[in-house]
Amino acid sequence: MAFFSMISILLGFVISSFIFIFFFKKLLSFSRKNMSEVSTLPSVPVVPGFPVIGNLLQLKEKKPHKTFTRWSEIYGPIYSIKMGSSSLIVLNSTETAKEAMVTRFSSISTRKLSNALTVLTCDKSMVATSDYDDFHKLVKRCLLNGLLGANAQKRKRHYRDALIENVSSKLHAHARDHPQEPVNFRAIFEHELFGVALKQAFGKDVESIYVKELGVTLSKDEIFKVLVHDMMEGAIDVDWRDFFPYLKWIPNKSFEARIQQKHKRRLAVMNALIQDRLKQNGSESDDDCYLNFLMSEAKTLTKEQIAILVWETIIETADTTLVTTEWAIYELAKHPSVQDRLCKEIQNVCGGEKFKEEQLSQVPYLNGVFHETLRKYSPAPLVPIRYAHEDTQIGGYHVPAGSEIAINIYGCNMDKKRWERPEDWWPERFLDDGKYETSDLHKTMAFGAGKRVCAGALQASLMAGIAIGRLVQEFEWKLRDGEEENVDTYGLTSQKLYPLMAIINPRRS
């Protein structure tokens, strides 16, 4: 019996082995066939450049998203450029961008960061810059459950209500005390937004903090500079070694000193804020803050990772909503007829009552204003570079493993084949028979697509939507003389280079 039992086991093993080998060969054959099909596709068109430096001199405008968009009119929606010794494939249409973000995601899910961003993100310790792995899934789940998801945003509603009431109060005070004098809209809105960011992160606003590592007490404005302004400045700092990786062994001391100083100051301030929060017993702060959530739900994270993840929520809240709201008010002030139409729509919905979040779905024209502003002034004109870790295809072209890929959101939103008069700000393009469609949220690509879609889309929509609505409901906005030409942006971002200066007149209740 033992002999026959052994024979039976051996026979089963042999049969299983043959089955495994058969299917493995089939799988290998299928894989090779697919790879063969990919490799026979044409190569991505190449933008002519110079020896050694490639196309770097052609990017001297320092606004690559605009240069990339102009090139797309010549070379098509997908092309390759040389950044020093590195090749970069640039995508400039919604179709190719969605293909990379959704259809080919499994082949292009890795981030490729500049030397500056590698330091400032603590080597991809942020949700937005981490590779799509277990760490990313954990921290994004925490971000949605603890702060940016639908349920979490309901819990944070009182922060948004206080934000718009404070902004409204300060604007009314300016109109009363300095009638017909331009108001610096950014100074007011930015200050209040930063307060909301701190409350969500630490449970309370912070007017000043003693930073032991720096030996100084910083005011709220100084905290903002360290945590937001300096980081935006550092993110676009250029290290020539990014373009010539084979020379990375050569020191670039001035660059390294600048970035490390910003990074260390940011961590020092974050550590001070975290320690201050941990000392609170709940009497002065809201226990439902993101720091508490991370510390209780993600115990595998290091202290530095927690600091960076909490900081990420601050910069996202304080920056994205500001960019969109400021540009929307600028365009509304520039186009009085659009402003009047929006004001009438809000009046028809609210009557004499204040506009509220619950009414956002009832104002399609306001939603058109919001999405058209996102289209023309996307807060992130360029998506952080991605890396193809295997051969794939995009737009009918072969993309070899090792390719670096840049998605030009600005170019997608200025594509003349997709958008009528893309250079014009025209909210009506988002209206379908006078109705707002929820799918409009993804038409502009401003929040990305697929598994890496921006976690902050809901918060940005709520904050900017209610802010724009209330500001137009309560004030008539006009640009000061010369303000219409103030359209320059800061570095690689869409933020206005100069703060919006407008003349406001309170509307009658």
From Swiss-Prot:
**How does it sit in the bilayer?**
Single-pass membrane protein
GO terms, molecular function: ent-kaurene oxidase activity; heme binding; iron ion binding
Q: Where in the cell is it found?
A: Plastid, Chloroplast outer membrane
**What pathway, per the record?**
Plant hormone biosynthesis; gibberellin biosynthesis
Q: Which cofactor does it need?
A: heme
InterPro entries per UniProt = Cyt_P450, Cyt_P450_CS, Cyt_P450_E_grp-I, Cyt_P450_sf, KO_chloroplastic
UniProt note on tissues of expression: Widely expressed. Highly expressed in influorescence tissues. In germinating seeds, it is mainly localized in the cortex and endodermis of embryo axis.
Q: List the disulfide bonds.
A: none
Keywords from UniProt, A to Z, are: Chloroplast, Heme, Iron, Membrane, Metal-binding, Monooxygenase, NADP, Oxidoreductase, Plastid, Plastid outer membrane, Transmembrane, Transmembrane helix
Please give the function described in this protein's UniProt entry: Catalyzes three successive oxidations of the 4-methyl group of ent-kaurene giving kaurenoic acid, a key step in gibberellins (GAs) biosynthesis. GAs, which are involved many processes, including stem elongation, play a central role in plant development.
Kindly provide the name given to this protein in its UniProt entry: Ent-kaurene oxidase, chloroplastic
This chain's source organism reads: Arabidopsis thaliana
Q: Which gene encodes it?
A: KO
